[in-house]
Amino acid sequence: SKAKMAIAKGEARAAKIEGITPAEIERKIRLDVHGRPKPAMRGWIHAVATPLALAAGIVLICLAHGIGLKWACAVFMTCSLVLFGNSACYHLGDWSPRVTDVLRRIDHMNIFLLIAGTYTPVSFALEPFWRNSIIAGMWICTTVALIIHVIWISAPRWLYVLVYIIFGVSGVAFMGLFWMSPYAGPTVVILLCAGGACYIAGAIVYALRKPDPWPKVFGFHEIFHTGTVAGYACHMVAIYMVIVQLWP
């Protein structure tokens, strides 16, 4: 229509004045819900991680001994697929405002799911009492965090990061148990801590919005996404080592 053409011409004229290229305008319309052009890599890191997480999860399930541990690995795989898959869809797709809001809420909640999903199979390295206590505690905290995120989606960025960090380091309280476990040991503890450090480092970059090395291609948000993938990889290897140690 004439109205849409007039609006498009006005946007193009404003973009020319601000020095924004047509390619950046297209990216802005397709991807950015905040009115800012997104880097070209936005969403692609998690898009690539999604099929890799599926393959890794299937391997863990096949290697796990016992129905309980297999289900625990399935929980970990599901949580990782939901995180990476939803993030890729959210950042790459051109969605309506309602769909964007739903994907954004899920995106903000997923890291809590992945942390709880990680401790679900790892805790099989411990005695049943501690295993059940950790799994129950993690999922109760996750449920509370999810409720907060659903109700207060517009919470300040710093609050999201604070809750994220507290949740991420909460497992430190159990590291002594994993260290002494014959089915885990120092290597598993180091991997769990390294994964947590990757999550925290990424969260700090996300909160500070810097470093922002190449804003048009690979910015601060991509560093955050890289941190989540690196943390996931560390934890996936830790789960693999526990599974191998639990073989009869």
Per-segment meaning from a language model:
Residues S1-P248:
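Multi-pass alpha-helical transmembrane bundles in non-GPCR membrane proteins
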